[in-house]
From Swiss-Prot:
Disulfide bonds: none annotated. This is Cysteine--tRNA ligase. Belongs to the class-I aminoacyl-tRNA synthetase family. InterPro entries: Cys-tRNA-ligase, Cys-tRNA-synt_Ia_DALR, Cys-tRNA/MSH_ligase, CysS_C, Rossmann-like_a/b/a_fold, tRNA-synt_1_cat_dom, tRNAsynth_Ia_anticodon-bd. Its cofactor is Zn(2+). It is found in: Cytoplasm. It comes from Phenylobacterium zucineum (strain HLK1). Its main location: cytoplasm. It comes from the Bacteria. The keyword Cytoplasm applies. Keywords: Aminoacyl-tRNA synthetase, ATP-binding, Cytoplasm, Ligase, Metal-binding, Nucleotide-binding, Protein biosynthesis, Zinc. Zn(2+) binds at C29, C211, H236, E240.
Length: 470
């Protein structure tokens, strides 16, 4: 089954054909680590994690290389460090650790590589040097700038005509720029800011060159897939493309920088893009204190990835209910002593995901599989139940769902005090049943029901779960 992906460059859905099926490469722009990331920052994380999983299923886990960078040199990091009176590295490492913890809680696999700007400085300086040597960059007043005239296809990725590109440049154009569209590759550091040595004087890199250098060092150029949010198409990815090609080839002609460009839509709140500058944000760090990460992942994938998605409490509640439904049928299908079913992916789920990651269709297929499994349970068809369990688990696992035991899922809504109370009541109930004190056993079951706890008795003992909300 052919994987089809929508390519921003061609404005069309294309069959995915990697340069080398034995070495499939993908790069996605990662975080600037100056604060806790909001849930909108994690939409690309979850979307491209899904693509990473699909690629690994297609080509093999050892044949897919995924790099997601970390920007740990930035004015916002500098300001945060100055406010706290600590080195910038302390701020960057703190929020990188929090970001990675949130990503894992959302079910995102760790990327193969997570390069940092501070650890790629030699490669950055080297790439700028090649651009200067190729006549695609020039030094001016301590800065080094990319000359957009060196790349004839500048504007092709974003589809913007020349006049729009010029109008989109800063109103106050620096006097040392030859063209308003030219952008900074290297700049002098201000007093108190971190700086690195370079042939053009001490300073630090511009934003765009960082990604190109990290891609080249981690994966090599060209890569198969370059991903990120739709807001990065221009200027960031447009500039990456221009400098990446020109660093490798004089006159801006030659190999492709990335074979496919993929971009996810905004996550909106109150019909505006979620943004710290606007103030309409929900931190993933805070949401994870209230909601299971798997439910947040479902919510993030509930819409087609290229379209905007409105983030609301209702969206999360619906995601939690959807997973409750799947976990419940999986729990009901489990019988002590049943043979473990080998997980496998249902063709309906595979077809949906291979159609440009059509997650709404894939989720609908999961519900169809769930209903079929429920029917097999009602018929008491052991073979069909075992097969259905394997089908549901394998299909959901490909999407990063049903990653835990049903009992763990249903108990995740209980705090430690409630868990201790339930376990104590179950122990009392077991003792009452052993003593044939049936009135007491029934009384305890009623107490558990009042706690919104459902008890399931089986040959291996009693298990419990939080009741599904009506």
């Amino acid at each position: 089954m052919t994987l089809k992906l929508y390519d921003t460059m061609t404005r069309a859905k294309r069959d995915f054909v990697p340069s080398d099926p034995e070495r499939v490469t993908m790069y996605v722009c990662g975080p600037t680590v100056y604060n806790y990331a909001h849930i909108g920052n994690f939409r690309p994380v979850v979307v491209f994690d899904l693509l990473f999983r699909v690629l690994r299923a297609l080509y093999g886990e050892d044949h897919v290389l995924y790099a997601a960078n970390v920007t740990d040199v930035d004015d916002k990091i500098n300001r945060k460090a100055a406010e706290e009176g600590v080195p910038i590295g302390v701020v960057a490492e703190r929020y990188l650790a929090a970001y990675n913890a949130d990503a894992r809680a959302l079910g995102a696999l760790a990327p193969t590589f997570q390069p940092k700007v501070t650890e790629t400085m030699d490669a950055i300086v080297g790439m700028i040097g090649r651009l200067v040597d190729n006549g695609a960059a020039y030094a001016a007043e301590g800065h080094v700038l990319f000359s957009t005239e060196a790349f004839p296809d500048y504007g092709k990725l974003s589809g913007r005509p020349l006049e729009d590109l010029i109008a989109g440049a800063r109103v106050d154009v620096a006097p040392y720029k030859k063209d308003p569209r030219d952008f900074v590759l290297w700049k002098p550091s201000k007093p108190g800011e971190p700086e690195w040595e370079s042939p053009w004087g001490p300073g630090r890199p511009g934003w765009h060159i960082e990604c190109s250098a990290m891609i080249e060092e981690a994966l090599g150029l060209p890569i198969d897939i370059h991903g990120g949010g739709i807001d990065l198409v221009f200027p960031h990815h447009e500039n990456e493309l221009a400098q990446g090609v020109c660093a490798a080839h004089p006159h801006g002609h030659g190999q492709t920088y990335a074979r496919y460009w993929l971009h996810n839509g905004f996550l909106n709140m109150a019909e505006e893009k979620m943004s710290k500058s606007v103030g309409n944000v929900a931190l993933a760090h805070d949401l994870l204190k209230t909601w299971p990460g798997e439910a947040l992942r479902w919510a993030l994938l509930s819409g087609q990835y290229r379209q905007p998605l409105e983030w609301t409490d209702t969206l999360i509640e619906q995601a939690k209910s959807a997973l409750d439904r799947l976990y419940r049928v999986l729990d009901d299908a489990a019988r002590p002593g049943d043979a473990a079913a080998e997980p496998f992916v249902d063709p309906r789920v595979e077809a949906a995901l291979h159609d440009d990651l059509n997650t709404p269709a894939a989720m609908a297929a999961l519900f169809q599989i769930s209903d079929e499994l429920r029917s097999a349970i009602m018929r008491k068809d052991a073979a069909a139940v075992a097969e259905g369990r394997g089908r549901l688990v394998g299909s959901a696992n490909l999407m990063g769902f049903l990653a835990q035991a049903p009992q763990a899922w249903f108990q995740s809504g209980a705090d430690e005090d409630l868990k201790a109370r339930v376990e104590d009541l179950l122990a009392q109930r077991q003792a009452a049943r052993a003593a044939k004190d049936w009135p007491r056993a029934d009384q305890i079951r009623a107490e558990l029901a009042a706690l919104n706890v459902e008890v399931m008795d089986g040959p291996s003992g009693a298990t419990w779960r939080i009741k599904e909300q009506a």
